[in-house]
Amino acid sequence: GSLLLVLFLLSVICYAEIAAGPTKCQYGRPCDSDRDCCWEYRCLSSGEEYTCKQDPGP
């Protein structure tokens, strides 16, 4: 029974991490894609690395 409890707790923690993903992203955080950033930011290159930045627009 205790193994199931551990698995349950792990799945809850993992789900919480995924659910909290967009809220903990901040401006200038390193990213691999736009999904790593909040909706108002985009994953843009500043020369060396990609970071979450405001979309400069068209």
Swiss-Prot record:
Positions of the propeptide segment: 17-26
Signal peptide positions are: 1-16
Cystine residue pairs? C25-C38, C31-C43, C37-C52
Instruction: Provide the coiled-coil residue spans.
Output: none
Gene Ontology CC terms: extracellular region
* Location of the protein in the cell: Secreted
Per the record, the domain comment is: The presence of a 'disulfide through disulfide knot' structurally defines this protein as a knottin.
Q: Know the name of this protein? A: Putative calcium channel toxin 196
Q: Which organism is it from?
A: Lychas mucronatus
